[in-house]
Regions:
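Short beta-strand-to-loop acidic/aromatic patch adjacent to the donor-nucleotide binding site
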Residues: 91-102
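A short, conserved alpha-helix in the catalytic core of glycosyltransferases
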Residues: 170, 175-177, 181-186, 191-218
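Glycine-rich, basic loop-to-helix element that forms the pyrophosphate-binding segment
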Residues: 68-89
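A conserved acidic beta->alpha catalytic loop
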Residues: 42-52
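Short beta-strand-to-loop element that shapes/binds the nucleotide-sugar donor at the catalytic cleft/hinge
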Residues: 126-141
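A recurrent flexible, glycine/aromatic-enriched loop bordering the glycosyltransferase active site
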Residues: 156-177, 243-246
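Non-catalytic, C-terminal membrane-associated alpha-helical segments of glycosyltransferases
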Residues: 232-311
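Short, well-formed alpha-helical segments that are part of the catalytic scaffolds
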Residues: 13-28
Length: 311
C-alpha cells in the first residue's frame, strides 16, 4: 500500500468539508507521510463557495475538484470521483470519505497494518472499514456490521475492540477498498440514488470471498445524522399522496434503493419488499408495529413524543 485515492463528494457543507480535509492532512503528517494521497472530490452543485475555499487552502497532497450536476446525490458524486481516480490510475486502493468526518491519527497506523494482516491471514487484500464515534459523547456511530435477520435486515454493529474483526458489510463513512477488489467488482452500482451502495458493495465483496475487516481503533469522529425513528412520526401525519411521494423520494424511504439492494444482495426479498413498501405507505402504523415486533422491539407506543429506534 503506497498510493491511495481519497474519494469524496460534497454539497453545501463548506465548513465541514474543510475540517474533514484538514483532519485528513494533520493525521497523515503526524503518522504516515510515506503514503501518497490524492484527493478526488466532486462539487455537486455547491452554492456556498466550497470549491473556492478548498482551492484557497494549502494542502501537501493534490486535490482534484470535479464538477457535478447538482443532482448526483452521494452515490453519483462518489462514482464521479471514483471514475476520475481510475482514469488517472496507479493507485493501490481507494478511500471512501464522507465530508462530515474528522479523521483521527490512529487511522493512519491501522490502515497499512490491515493490509499486512490481510495478506498474511487471507492471502489477498480486501476492504477495511473504519469505525466512527460521536465527538461529544464518544458513542459508536458508524462502522462494520453483520446481518442478524436477512428478512428485516436487522444488523448487529461491531464496535472496534483493539483487534481486527471480520464483518459482512459496512458503512462508507471512512472505508478503504483495495485495488484487487475493484478489479473484481468494479466501482459502485450506478443504479442507486443517494445512499445504500456502501452496504451493497461491502456485502457483495464479502459474498465474493474478499475479507471485509473492521479496523482495531476508531478511525474518525462523526455524528449520527439519522433520526432515531427514521422519520416515522412525520410520515404518519402525512396525507396518502405525500406518503407515496416520500416512499419514492431519494431523501425519504427510497423504495427504489430498497428494491435494488434486495435484487442484488438478497433476491428472494424482492417481492416482499415491493409489497411491504406500499403497505408502509397505505397502513403506516400497522406496518411499523409489525416491523418493530419482527426486529425484537417489545414495547411499542405511538405516542407522538416517543421515538422508536430501528437499530
Amino acid at each position: 500500500m503506497n498510493r491511495i485515492a481519497v474519494l469524496m463528494t460534497c454539497h453545501n457543507r463548506k465548513d465541514k468539508t474543510l475540517r474533514c480535509l484538514s483532519s485528513l492532512q494533520d493525521g497523515w503528517r503526524i503518522t504516515n507521510r510515506e503514503l501518497f494521497l490524492s484527493i478526488f472530490i466532486t462539487d455537486d452543485g455547491c452554492t456556498d463557495g466550497t470549491a473556492q475555499a478548498i482551492r484557497e487552502q494549502s494542502f501537501t497532497f493534490p486535490v482534484h475538484i470535479l464538477q457535478g450536476s447538482g443532482n448526483l446525490y452521494w452515490n453519483g458524486g462518489m462514482i464521479n470521483s471514483w471514475k476520475a481516480a481510475r482514469a488517472e490510475g496507479g493507485f493501490d486502493g481507494y478511500l471512501w470519505l464522507n465530508d462530515d468526518v474528522v479523521v483521527l491519527s490512529e487511522f493512519w497506523t491501522d490502515l497499512p497494518a490491515a493490509d499486512i494482516f490481510c495478506q498474511e491471514n487471507y492471502g489477498k487484500k480486501g476492504i477495511y472499514v473504519g469505525s466512527t464515534k460521536d465527538a461529544d459523547t464518544g458513542a459508536f456511530t458508524y462502522g462494520g456490521f453483520n446481518y442478524v435477520n436477512k428478512l428485516t435486515l436487522k444488523d448487529q454493529l461491531l464496535p472496534p475492540n483493539g483487534s481486527f474483526q471480520t464483518c459482512e458489510a459496512g458503512h462508507g463513512n471512512i472505508t478503504y477498498v483495495s485495488e484487487n477488489v475493484v478489479n473484481h467488482l468494479g466501482i459502485f452500482c450506478d443504479k442507486y440514488i443517494h445512499g445504500g451502495t456502501d452496504h451493497d458493495y461491502t456485502y457483495l465483496a464479502h459474498k465474493a470471498g474478499f475479507p471485509v475487516l473492521i479496523l482495531p481503533h476508531y478511525a474518525a469522529a462523526c455524528r449520527n445524522d439519522h433520526s432515531k425513528d427514521g422519520g416515522r412520526k412525520n410520515f404518519f401525519s402525512l396525507p396518502l399522496r405525500e406518503r407515496l411521494h416520500y416512499l419514492h423520494s431519494p431523501l425519504g424511504l427510497n423504495l427504489h434503493n430498497a428494491l435494488l439492494f434486495s435484487r442484488r444482495c438478497f433476491p428472494w426479498r424482492y417481492p416482499i419488499i415491493l409489497i411491504t413498501g406500499y403497505l408502509k405507505a397505505l397502513f403506516p402504523k400497522t406496518y411499523y408495529r409489525c416491523y418493530l415486533r419482527a426486529r425484537g422491539v417489545k414495547q411499542i407506543s405511538w405516542d407522538p413524543n416517543t421515538n422508536h429506534s430501528c437499530s
